[in-house]
């Protein structure tokens, strides 16, 4: 039977509950346990798919096409286990499920209430489908004290009494701020956060305390006394230079041992930390450096590109180099010469996005990469714009654009109205809802034999995750191929372009899918490994 660790956060948001959950899962995995991680988000959106990147950050897409919280990306990267739609739920989805049942009459005339109906729905989500897991880690989004989180806290309180003894552990992540004028770390915010948690009937078993400097033993004892936890259960979580140091740091502080002790497990095998130590060594001892430019439109919030940042780092690990990222807001290139920003970088990456804003700037960046033979990777929107750039500047069709931007007879990129998902055709219309209506999840693509991309993958059949509503118009394939482009990846039915490359260039590839979503530190995605390898070669030309 699965054991449950409920992870809550207090004092402030963005403390890193997702990283803490992922790191703990990695430590339990290293001891040989089977671990599942789930994220419960208190917001009323059904999913984050229609939320602004500035509000939410990245939308992480799973193989089964679920649009989820970016923390699921951390879970996958740290554990190597692919998540699915059953690993993330929101208040919006819970309420929608309940209202649908009420309309069907499933509640037999009962008054539908937060307790028991909402809390029961939450508990069902937490406890269903865990037969193959030894531990289930549940991260509760938001901060203790938020009104939106109250039903979730009540649900996990109830589970403590409903599950067998020693089946539930509560871990609370807090912050100990350093007050420079006093020269002290302060415990009071943590005390008040724990008091807030205790007021809803939850007594934390473990305190994971974020701090920017070592916590004195006297302060740990103080937290132990006033928060009613064992001294050994006050774990310091010091700032580290990379998230891949976190599992090692938490193990040294005894987090995994304390978790097992709280469950009454005294004979657990020692964790095998070799691969984490190897990753940490390669990060801290690179054999060189390269610089790439990411030309985006959400660069004001780096969380909008979280998986991309990590995938680039994984490419660096594969090549034993540190990758420096120059973040460039695409709109700058609509006024400034791209050469001022791009002439010294070793690679250019144009990531996914939506909407016309910044598109012309990205097109100019792509043109610069193509003309100056700088390694280029275009992802999703980046591939679409690479096709538009080529049709304009190589084929001479000046009005080439996307139907997403404007009405034009030269729509190189258009709205997909239907596509094959497995054996079923899915259809969309321009007037349909935005939420959950894209081509989402893992799809097979066939790669052209002996193409650059097929050599990178080492195969001609791949399965990658997608998230897009628009697609390159297949009718422009012949035009682009006359000017040196190759449509090197297609959907199995030959209708949807999946990858392009430019023969007159050392490394120029665009893909319609999102390879960053499947990259892992222990298994870097081949496209990013190859892209960074190309930037290493480019750096030798400087």
Swiss-Prot record:
Give positions of region: Amidoligase domain: 1-265
Which residues are noted in the entry as ATP-binding? 14-19, 71
Q: Which Pfam families match?
A: CTP_synth_N (PF06418), GATase (PF00117)
What are the binding positions for CTP in this chain?
13, 146-148, 186-191, 222
List positions binding L-glutamine: 54, 353, 381-384, 404, 469
Q: What is its EC number?
A: 6.3.4.2
**GO terms for cellular component:** cytosol
GO MF terms on file?
Answer: ATP binding; CTP synthase activity; glutaminase activity; identical protein binding; metal ion binding
Binding-site residues for UTP, renumbered to this chain: 13, 186-191, 222
Return the InterPro entries for the record: Class_I_gatase-like (IPR029062), CTP_synthase (IPR004468), CTP_synthase_N (IPR017456), GATASE (IPR017926), GATase1_CTP_Synthase (IPR033828), P-loop_NTPase (IPR027417)
Quaternary assembly: Homotetramer.
General function of this protein:
Catalyzes the ATP-dependent amination of UTP to CTP with either L-glutamine or ammonia as the source of nitrogen. Regulates intracellular CTP levels through interactions with the four ribonucleotide triphosphates.
Spell out the NCBIfam families in the cross-references. PRK05380.1, PyrG
Give the record's family classification: Belongs to the CTP synthase family.
Query: Which protein, by its recorded name, is this?
Result: CTP synthase
**Origin species:** Bartonella bacilliformis (strain ATCC 35685 / KC583 / Herrer 020/F12,63)
Gene name of this polypeptide: pyrG
């Amino acid at each position: 039977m699965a054991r449950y660790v409920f992870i809550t956060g207090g004092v402030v948001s963005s403390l890193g509950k997702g990283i803490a959950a992922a790191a703990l899962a990695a430590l339990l995995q290293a001891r040989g346990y089977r671990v599942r991680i789930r994220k419960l988000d208190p917001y009323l959106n059904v999913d984050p798919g229609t939320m602004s990147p500035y509000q939410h950050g990245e939308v992480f897409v799973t193989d089964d096409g679920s649009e989820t919280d970016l923390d699921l990306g951390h879970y996958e990267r740290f554990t190597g286990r692919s998540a699915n739609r059953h690993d993330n739920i929101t208040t919006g989805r819970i309420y929608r499920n309940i209202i649908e049942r009420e309309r069907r009459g499933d509640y037999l005339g009962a008054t539908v209430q937060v307790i028991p109906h909402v809390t029961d729905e939450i508990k069902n989500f937490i406890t269903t489908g865990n037969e193959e897991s030894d531990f289930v880690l549940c991260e509760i989004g938001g901060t203790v004290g938020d009104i939106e989180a109250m039903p979730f806290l009540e649900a996990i309180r109830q589970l403590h009494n409903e599950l067998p003894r020693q089946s539930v552990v509560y871990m609370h992540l807090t912050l100990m701020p350093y007050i420079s004028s006093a020269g002290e770390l302060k415990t009071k915010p943590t005390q008040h956060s724990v008091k807030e948690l205790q007021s809803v009937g939850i007594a934390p078993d473990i305190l994971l305390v974020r701090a920017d400097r070592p916590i004195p033993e006297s302060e740990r004892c103080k937290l132990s006394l006033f928060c009613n936890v064992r001294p050994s259960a006050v774990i310091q979580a010091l700032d580290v230079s990379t998230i891949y140091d976190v599992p090692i740091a938490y193990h040294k502080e005894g987090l995994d041992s304390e978790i097992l002790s709280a469950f009454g497990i005294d004979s657990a095998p020692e964790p095998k930390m070799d691969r984490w130590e190897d990753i940490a060594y390669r990060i801290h001892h690179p054999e060189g450096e390269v610089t790439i430019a990411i030309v985006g439109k959400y660069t004001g919030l780096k969380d909008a590109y979280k998986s991309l940042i990590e995938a680039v780092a994984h490419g660096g690990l594969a090549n034993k180099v540190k990758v420096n990222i120059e973040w460039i807001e695409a709109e700058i290139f609509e006024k400034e010469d791209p050469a001022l920003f791009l002439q010294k970088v070793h690679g250019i990456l144009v990531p996914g996005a939506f909407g016309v804003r910044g598109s012309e700037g990205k097109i100019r960046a792509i043109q610069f990469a193509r003309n100056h033979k700088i390694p280029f990777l275009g992802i999703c929107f980046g591939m679409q714009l690479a096709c538009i750039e080529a049709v304009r500047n190589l084929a001479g069709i000046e009005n080439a654009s996307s139907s997403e931007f404007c009405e034009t007879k030269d729509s190189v990129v258009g709205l997909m109205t239907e596509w094959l998902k497995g054996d079923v055709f899915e259809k969309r219309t321009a007037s349909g809802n935005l939420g959950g209506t894209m081509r989402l999840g893992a799809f097979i693509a066939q790669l052209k034999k002996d193409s650059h991309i097929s050599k990178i993958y080492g195969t001609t059949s791949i399965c990658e995750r997608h998230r897009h509503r628009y697609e390159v118009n297949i009718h422009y394939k012949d035009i682009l191929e006359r000017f040196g482009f190759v449509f090197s990846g297609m959907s199995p039915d030959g209708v949807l372009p999946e990858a392009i490359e430019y023969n007159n260039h050392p490394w120029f590839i665009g893909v319609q899918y999102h390879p960053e979503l499947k990259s892992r530190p222990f298994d870097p995605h081949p496209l990013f490994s190859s892209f960074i390898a190309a930037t290493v070669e480019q750096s030798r030309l400087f």
